[in-house]
Regions:
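Short, surface-exposed beta-strand segments enriched in small/polar/acidic residues
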Residues: 10-14, 34-66, 89-93
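Short amphipathic alpha-helical surface patches that serve as generic macromolecular interface elements
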Residues: 15-17, 67-74
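Periplasmic peptidoglycan-binding/tethering modules of Gram-negative envelope proteins
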Residues: 1-44, 95-99, 105-107
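Periplasmic OmpA/Pal-like peptidoglycan-binding modules at the C-termini of bacterial envelope proteins
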Residues: 71, 75-107
Length: 107
């Protein structure tokens, strides 16, 4: 049963992929670790946010890129020891972002 993402409040972590080689793992590890220490049954919502492009094709490319980034972040979370069943994944497009972003919410 795939958990659903509830987007409310501010994200715990925002990873901006303006550089595809961004080093986000330490920040992510610390944030997840602190959250799990406080609430051992915490679950997380991972939201891939793609910028709206100048046309439909560009928006599609942005969506495809950000989904790959989100999968990379999910693999990082699992490598930290977080069970994949504790992470729900979803995607959206937004006019509020200019580069692909991955937002992580505590559920």
């Amino acid at each position: 049963d795939v958990p659903k993402v509830t987007i409310s409040g501010l994200p715990l972590v925002v990873i901006r992929f303006d550089d595809p080689d961004i080093n986000y793992e330490k920040t992510l590890f610390d944030a997840i670790g602190t959250t799990v220490d406080k609430k051992s049954d915490a679950t997380f919502g991972l939201v891939a946010v793609a910028p709206i492009g100048k046309n439909e094709g560009e928006t599609r490319i942005n969506s495809s890129k950000v989904k790959k980034y989100a999968e990379r972040v999910l693999r990082s979370l699992v490598s930290f020891g977080l069970p994949s069943k504790k992470v729900a994944l979803t995607a959206k497009t937004s006019g509020d972002v200019v580069v692909p972003e991955v937002h992580i919410y505590v559920q």
